[in-house]
């Protein structure tokens, strides 16, 4: 956590911090992973997903899309991440985006500003993905490593499975049928799982497994099954791999990963920037963001997909995806 956050905590009594820590563990972090997700807030507070996302965006200092304990302190103390900054620092952020210095940020300036920061952090994102996926330590990602790790890190699917609560529901269902707890389903377990609502023949189950089994081990891991629910086939993922593997040598280099991330995320960034302009320019509805709008709306509620690209430059945080 940043020095700013440390200073904020330093002004609080130790017993208050301990009490908040217990509250965080007992009532908020329901899956005990050390963070509070949008899905957990929705369930706990009976909020809409949009409300939960907005709350997390206002507190998400390290821009990972979750609420860490230190960020939870901000929430419980009625503060927000922008209060960790001085007015001069926020003004500097605004001026960095306002390229022509006319006191307002145009859609084009926002596009260019976000992309400038984006190009600076994409190398770090690529290196992090390579490190996470590279099981054999050769500095590259082969097809099997891509299947095992990256298909759940990159936004390849377009279906409802990007909803965290949806994923959690199916993960719990999946685990009920994973009798030995090894994280995968055998043919028999898969048959039992899939036949809850509809009866399938052995041949149909075998065909389904062949479509879902990304690493060809004859079993179905949860990530494989979940990608199938998201409308992503094995052939589609292979096409994604080959599109990133520019030299067609069967493995992805760090340089190729930079290219792949840029291509995959470009459309997402376009969508998020357009959404930011629409949601931020609410006072005079002129299609631009003035300084008041920047402070009161844009900076506070910036979605974490853009947050993770822009604000870490000022926070000194690593980008997580």
UniProtKB/Swiss-Prot annotation:
PANTHER family assigned to the protein according to its UniProt record, in alphabetical order: CALCIUM-BINDING PROTEIN, RETICULOCALBIN
Alphabetical list of SUPFAM superfamilies matching this protein: EF-hand
Binding residue positions for Ca(2+) 1: 29, 31, 33, 35, 40
List of residues binding Ca(2+) 4: 134, 136, 138, 140, 145
Disulfide bridge partners, by residue number: none
Chain sites annotated for binding Ca(2+) 7: 245, 247, 249, 251, 256, 284, 286, 288, 293
Residues holding Ca(2+) 3: 98, 100, 102, 104, 109
Name of the protein described by the UniProt record: Calcium-binding protein LPS1-alpha
Domain (EF-hand): residue spans on this chain: 15-49, 47-82, 85-120, 121-156, 165-200, 200-233, 232-267, 269-304
Single annotated GO MF: calcium ion binding
List of residues binding Ca(2+) 2: 60, 62, 64, 66, 71
Residues engaged in binding Ca(2+) 5: 178, 180, 182, 184, 189
Reported tissue expression: Aboral ectoderm, a squamous epithelium covering the surface of the late stage embryo and larva.
Binding site for Ca(2+) 6: 213, 215, 217, 219, 224
InterPro entries cross-referenced by the UniProt entry: EF-hand-dom_pair (IPR011992), EF_Hand_1_Ca_BS (IPR018247), EF_hand_dom (IPR002048)
Keyword annotations of the record: Calcium, Metal-binding, Repeat
Function: Calcium-binding protein involved in larval development and metamorphosis. Likely to function as calcium buffers mediating the transport of calcium from the sea water to the blastocoel where calcium is required for skeleton formation.
């Amino acid at each position: 956590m940043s020095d700013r956050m440390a200073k904020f905590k330093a002004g609080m009594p130790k017993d208050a911090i301990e009490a908040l820590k217990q509250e965080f563990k007992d009532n908020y972090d329901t899956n005990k992973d050390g963070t509070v997700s949008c899905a957990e807030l929705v369930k706990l507070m009976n909020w809409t997903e949009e409300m939960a996302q907005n709350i997390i965006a206002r507190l998400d200092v390290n821009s990972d899309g979750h609420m860490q304990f230190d960020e939870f302190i901000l929430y419980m103390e009625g503060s927000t991440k922008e209060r960790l900054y001085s007015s001069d620092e926020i003004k500097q952020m605004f001026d960095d985006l306002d390229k022509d210095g006319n006191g307002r940020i145009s859609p084009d300036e926002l596009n260019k500003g976000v992309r400038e920061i984006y190009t600076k952090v994409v190398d770090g994102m690529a290196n992090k993905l390579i490190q996470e996926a590279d099981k054999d330590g050769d500095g590259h990602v082969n097809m099997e490593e891509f299947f095992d790790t990256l298909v759940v890190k990159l936004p390849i699917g377009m279906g409802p499975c990007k909803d965290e609560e949806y994923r959690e529901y199916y993960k719990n269902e999946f685990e009920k049928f994973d009798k030995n707890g090894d994280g995968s389903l055998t043919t028999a377990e898969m048959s039992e799982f899939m036949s809850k609502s509809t009866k399938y023949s052995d041949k149909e189950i075998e065909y389904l497994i062949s479509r879902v089994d990304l690493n060809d081990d004859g079993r179905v891991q949860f990530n494989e099954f979940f990608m199938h629910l998201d409308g992503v086939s094995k052939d589609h993922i292979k096409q994604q791999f080959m599109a990133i593997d520019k030299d067609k040598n069967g493995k992805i280099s760090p340089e190729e990963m930079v290219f792949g991330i840029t291509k995959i995320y470009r459309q997402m960034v376009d969508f998020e920037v357009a959404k930011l302009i629409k949601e931020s320019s609410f006072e005079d509805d002129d299609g631009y963001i003035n300084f008041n709008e920047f402070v009161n709306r844009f900076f506070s509620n910036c979605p974490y997909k853009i947050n993770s690209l822009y604000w870490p430059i000022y926070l000194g945080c690593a980008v997580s995806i």
